Amino acid sequence: MGSIEEVKKESAEETLGRLLRGEINDEELKKLIKYQLEKRLQWGYKSSHQEQLSFNLDFINSLKKMGMSGQVEAFTNEVYELPTECFEAAYGKSMKLSGCYFKHESSTIDEAEEASHELYCERAQIKDGQTVLDIGCGQGGLVLYVAQKYKNCHVTGLTNSKEQVNYILKQAEKLGLRNVDVILADVTQYESDKTYDRILVIGVVEHMKNMQLFIKKLSTWMAEDSLLFVDHSCHKTFNHFFEALDEDDWYSGYIFPPGCATFLSADSLLYFQDDVSVVDHWVVNGMHFARTVDAWRKKLDKNMEAVKEILLPGLGGNHEAVNGVITHIRTCCVGGYVQFSLNDGDEWMNAQLLFKKK
């Protein structure tokens, strides 16, 4: 790694204070975030390959001693339980809450959402007539896409958000879909004897800790010839928790509450094959994620006043609280762009893996 471009020295509290008061423009914000991310890269990259392997293996072994999931409740309440109208005003048409796939330079966010869903179906080898389970289904974009494309598939979404369950079921009814179910449950606590032909896990691994326990649980829902498709954000080389590196790291703890987010390396899930075997493995360049969050930011800025009005009732009419939520969403978008566009998208990216049951 080269030298890090220095920024104005101030405490994490001072930086956050200026951010929340609206005193940091996007240009400065990008520089401040890049500084923290470059420190992360210097921390994560080791001087020899053996040292890198040992560093990663120590991290992987530490996960096996933890509980299944991180402390995601605060993040869920802050992000996923926002009013659906807020997502409609800031995200794409299907309100996909993870990275999209931009086939062309001219692709819109709506087109990138659909291309992403198409890619998932292709790589998961979904065929008409199968039973499909989407873990952490969000607003149901993928559930509804699969249900419409494969009329004889029965598609089940699983989410711990009541708001999301209600939205998906209403959309399925509007579309006349009778092949959609949604389960309201925490995946780490949910138990069922039912099995599925395909299991999709998009943007969930990032909120897990003990991957061994998580994949073991998923394997119990896999039919004999089932396939498990996983997509997760990652760094290409090293693993890390998205937590503050030092007392000056204002960014990591602001984006995710402590214990909430895990970024594996692109190949770390290959160390968790007790109950499954890898069939295929891909990476998606980080620029796709960067373009996704940049599109979200632009749409949010365009609809800013409407979003404020949507958020205000749920926050007790507190304008300061509304501004706080919007600042957090915008900072996530700006930060995601900086992070996933570093080195032309070849640092942080998305890994996609296909597993079969052992």
Curated annotation (Swiss-Prot):
Quaternary organization: Homodimer.
Record family assignment: Belongs to the CFA/CMAS family.
Induction behaviour: Down-regulated by elicitor treatment.
GO cellular component, one term: cytoplasm
UniProt keyword Methyltransferase present: yes
Gene3D superfamilies per the UniProt record, alphabetical: Vaccinia Virus protein VP39
Keywords: Cytoplasm, Methyltransferase, S-adenosyl-L-methionine, Transferase
Function: N-methyltransferase with a strict substrate specificity for (R,S)-tetrahydropalmatine or (R,S)-stylopine.
GO MF annotation list: (S)-tetrahydroprotoberberine N-methyltransferase activity
Chief localisation class: cytoplasm
UniProt-recorded name of the protein: Probable (S)-tetrahydroprotoberberine N-methyltransferase 2
Gene behind the chain: TNMT2
Lineage of origin: Eukaryota, Viridiplantae, Streptophyta, Embryophyta, Tracheophyta
Location in the cell: Cytoplasm
Amino-acid positions noted as binding S-adenosyl-L-methionine in the UniProt annotation, renumbered to this chain: S98, G136, N160, Q164, D186, V187, I202
Record field: catalytic activity: (S)-stylopine + S-adenosyl-L-methionine = (S)-cis-N-methylstylopine + S-adenosyl-L-homocysteine; (S)-tetrahydropalmatine + S-adenosyl-L-methionine = (S)-cis-N-methyltetrahydropalmatine + S-adenosyl-L-homocysteine
InterPro entries the record matches: SAM-dependent_MTases_sf
Pfam families registered for this protein in UniProt: CMAS (PF02353)
Annotated source species: Papaver bracteatum (Great scarlet poppy)
GO biological process: methylation
UniProt key word Heme: no
Active-site residues, Swiss-Prot/TrEMBL: C333
Catalytic EC class: transferase
Pathway of action: Alkaloid biosynthesis
EC number: 2.1.1.-
